[in-house]
Curated annotation (Swiss-Prot):
<comment type="pathway">
    <text>One-carbon metabolism; formaldehyde assimilation via serine pathway.</text>
</comment>
<protein>
    <recommendedName>
        <fullName>Methenyltetrahydrofolate cyclohydrolase</fullName>
        <ecNumber>3.5.4.9</ecNumber>
    </recommendedName>
</protein>
<keyword id="KW-0472">Membrane</keyword>
<dbReference type="Pfam" id="PF04961">
    <property type="entry name" value="FTCD_C"/>
</dbReference>
<dbReference type="InterPro" id="IPR054893">
    <property type="entry name" value="MthfCyhylase"/>
</dbReference>
<dbReference type="InterPro" id="IPR036178">
    <property type="entry name" value="Formintransfe-cycloase-like_sf"/>
</dbReference>
<dbReference type="InterPro" id="IPR007044">
    <property type="entry name" value="Cyclodeamin/CycHdrlase"/>
</dbReference>
<keyword id="KW-1133">Transmembrane helix</keyword>
<dbReference type="GO" id="GO:0004477">
    <property type="term" value="F:methenyltetrahydrofolate cyclohydrolase activity"/>
</dbReference>
<dbReference type="GO" id="GO:0006730">
    <property type="term" value="P:one-carbon metabolic process"/>
</dbReference>
<comment type="subunit">
    <text>Homodimer.</text>
</comment>
<feature type="transmembrane region" description="Helical">
    <location>
        <begin position="25"/>
        <end position="46"/>
    </location>
</feature>
<keyword id="KW-0812">Transmembrane</keyword>
<dbReference type="GO" id="GO:0016020">
    <property type="term" value="C:membrane"/>
</dbReference>
<keyword id="KW-0554">One-carbon metabolism</keyword>
<keyword id="KW-0378">Hydrolase</keyword>
<comment type="similarity">
    <text>Belongs to the cyclodeaminase/cyclohydrolase family.</text>
</comment>
Length: 208
């Protein structure tokens, strides 16, 4: 989302026939909502006498979650830029052998970026999940369900962005590059999946 774009405007764009914003932007905003909910739990815990012992920890979490929220929000534009670069590369002329070679090189360059951008989103969503675990354990019990929604939102963002990694990595000729990214992605998914289940159960036990 642009700096002053409303959520309604973003969703109108998402629903339109325009190719961007698309799933990559939705993944980033899902992660950003997770980070925002982590911040919410922190803000509703800090300053409460009952939670004075964890206040210092949650102030640190809050600083990190706000940084991650800004990063993820910025990734919406990164996704659009990466998509546009791929489409632009495919649109290059291919009338001569030289043009074909230049076009192929540009496509591969753009696909590498289009693989790395959603992978970066996955990494940041993974960080949000770590912070969600902290607030699920230490946060104000009155808003502990929001910690659960935080982890679910971040996990959804990670898994959603992962689909774009798969799509773009598939088209790469540099298989070593692709396999390196896919290996990292599988690790992120495995770690986040286990954490997602654990944190959800932690939150559920506190609200029941």
């Amino acid at each position: 989302m642009a700096g002053n774009e409303t959520i309604e405007t973003f969703l109108d764009g998402l629903a339109s026939s325009a190719p961007t914003p698309g799933g990559g932007g939705a993944a980033a905003i899902s992660g950003a909502m997770g980070a925002a909910l982590v911040s919410m739990v922190c803000n509703l815990t800090i300053g409460k006498k009952k939670y004075v012992e964890v206040e210092a920890d949650l102030k640190q979490v809050l600083e990190k979650s706000e940084g991650l929220r800004r990063t993820l929000t910025g990734m919406i534009a990164d996704d659009v830029e990466a998509f546009d670069a791929v489409m632009g590369a495919y649109g290059l002329p291919k009338n001569t052998d030289e043009e074909k070679a230049a076009r192929a090189a540009k496509i591969q360059e753009a696909l590498k970026t289009a693989t790395d951008v959603p992978l970066a989103c996955c990494r940041v969503c993974r960080e949000v999940i770590d912070l969600a675990e902290i607030v699920a354990e230490k946060g104000n019990l009155n808003v502990i369900s929001d910690a659960g929604v935080a982890v679910l939102s971040a996990y959804a963002g990670l898994r959603s962005a992962a689909l774009n990694v798969y799509v773009n990595a598939k088209g790469l000729d540099d298989r070593a590059f692709a396999e390196e990214r896919l290996k990292e992605l599988e690790g992120l998914l495995a770690e986040a999946g286990a954490l997602n289940e654990r944190i959800y159960e932690t939150v559920k036990s506190k609200v029941n």
